[in-house]
Amino acid sequence: MKYLLIILFFSTILLSQTKPIQGSVIDEKGEPLFNVNIVSKPSNTGTQSDDKGVFIFEIPIHDQQIILDHIGYEQETLNAILFKNGTRVTLMQKVVELKPLDVTGAGREQFSPFETKNSVIILDTEELAVRGFVDIGDALFSEQSIVMNETMNGQKSISVRASAPEEMIYLYDGIRINTLGDPLLDLSIFSASGFSGIELVKGGHEKALSSSGIINFIPKLTYGSSASFTQQFGTYNYGGFDGFGSIGSSLVSLNGGIGEGQFSQIYIDAEKPEITTSHQRQFGHLGIKNRYNLEFRFMGFKNGKQFQNYRTGNSVSIDMENIIGKMIHSSPIGGEIIFFGLLQNNLGIESTNSYTINKEDLNNGFGFSFEKPIRSAMAKFNGETNYLTSNWDIDSLTFITKRVNSIFTGSFELVQPERNQGIQLKDVKIVLSKHLISDTPDSSFDEIMDTETWDESSSMFTGSIVSIMSQKRIMLYTNLGNVFRLPSLNERFSNHIRSTNQGTIGLIPEYKNQFEMGIKIENENDNEKPYYAINISGFNYHYSNKIKQIQLTGVPIQFPINYGEASLSGFDSNLSFSSKTKWFNFSSSYAYYLFSDPMAFQLQPDKMVRNKITLKIRWFQLDLIQRSESARQITSINSTGTFLDNRLDAIQTYDANLSLKLKFREYKGTISISGKNLNNESQVLNGISLFDQRYNLNLGLSWK
């Protein structure tokens, strides 16, 4: 406490090291421009011009640049040191084809592809919608070097860097949503509709220290009026639609959408599909902001799914509801504070020949985030608490458990202002986190699963060096961490109920020591020059008490055990290139892993490749995708208690998409034809053909 008071005292002194900036923005005709984004670098202090084109804010005295950016106008960069108050800045209009449906405003993206000390990939959901992916899981699997696992009951989950799917953290506008009894988020119930972007982060991060991967869904929140509709048709009874509409102004926005879809799967010895899946989606977003850096967001979605396997008799029904309220206040001199509330309700029925489970999860959560620049430093504090009640009926047994889950994270980062050239230390950061969990089962459940309390601490250190050359930036970064993962309620239930060996009953936290080092290279994104970006990272993870899933043979049932010590080393890379006129684009994603024990990392290939070529010629766009994976292994156990090692063969597939985009005034129409797995090389799991050959027709129409 004494040191905290000292830090706060000096912070108050340092915060006064600012200077006022005042000016105005006009166009070539001398008319004022409002809602122009003005950002001071490197502190990222920002504001917007008002309806008279005037902007007033304070910036740290060490800032060097003031950047003015507005849709449809050339970006202007001014010298912050030489800037004279009262300056009138003229922005020149440019002719560009804008993305009409959504502009991701300041603060919407949670991660920077270059600045974040991780591998960060941002997916364009408008492009994903055009190409007619079945769901978000299908899109991520096609685009990136990640593993998608699909159970016999149609649940789709992904893993990054050979980690367990339970490690993944899913965010909705920066708020974690996989906080229920089962941390696996079924990606088959999400489509690209409703999102303006998707961020994929590989490796541990301050927002999720124990995870090897993060996915952040950026919800659409268009401050303006727009609408869109897409319709899909395809083989194996694939079809669906998504509709979106938005009304609003520069200060208020209300939008929403609905969607439905269905598809089928086939057994390799069958002539027609025997597995069907249908899903429904609804979402709504409300945004209210003023001209003083205050914004309120209210977001909600309700997704449902019905799965039926007519051969086995297995069926699944899911209804997932989420409501999020968020208040964001950004300071004109840098930093921001966020408060949020979360309400979740999840209903699920899973029926097989072996059992029937009715799941009802109700979660109420709240939290905050606070960050403040302190001269050449940044202090951040984050906290969240979730109150979860799980009411599960398993055959004739009823289990009611309450879990209180609290996380508090603090970080302190020293930031060196970037010079125009040369090699320099960019930043160093230390992150400390405290995680508290308390499980309290119903009294009738005590003899099956006891009360448990965990109090664990994690830490991480990050640092980076940057080199700025002519038209190019290079960053070297490293991450060191000692983190943990606590068992979910679903893992604890499954372990107690389904373990076949008395010695494996009871789960303890999984610990992980992690090390990562990487390099990022990118050139200046100039319309007059080709653009490229390279990201290569190597890492090592060492697990203690690793939690591993065991599959029961012939039924869609898994249960976890603590496997013991295991380690993983590897590297992944991402390369992207765009020609000068953007008619040719190439991206490549590659991953290679070394396992101390392959059976400790279920269904994980040791090599993955994704290559994509995009050609844009006038109204036409052609996408060619090649992807390959090495063989995968999984451990199962039969009715006699014997462990069996199973294998999925290596796979290499080719996809293609041809689209036609036409624009007339404020309307845009799209027609695309997609073919997946054109070489018809599929994998087989439990007799079901995975990633089989499919053809889709997609139609889209949008306004503004």
Task: List PLM regions with ranges.
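Short acidic/polar hinge/loop motifs at secondary-structure boundaries
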Residues: 55-58, 148, 175-203, 217
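Outer-membrane beta-barrel domain signature, especially the mid-to-C-terminal portions
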Residues: 273-276, 314, 347-350, 440-443, ...
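A beta-strand signature from Gram-negative outer-membrane beta-barrel systems
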Residues: 88-90, 189-228
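Outer membrane beta-barrel strand-and-loop segments of large Gram-negative receptors
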Residues: 283-285, 363-369, 407-411, 504-508, ...
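Structural signature of Gram-negative outer-membrane beta-barrels, strongest in the C-terminal barrel
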Residues: 329, 376-389, 393-541, 619
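Extracytoplasmic beta-strand/coil segments of soluble accessory domains associated
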Residues: 137-176, 203
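Short, acidic, small-residue-rich periplasmic hinge/interaction motif at the N-terminus
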Residues: 26, 37-41, 69-73, 83-129, ...
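Periplasmic-side early beta-strands and strand-to-turn transitions of outer-membrane beta-barrels
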Residues: 224-225, 244-319
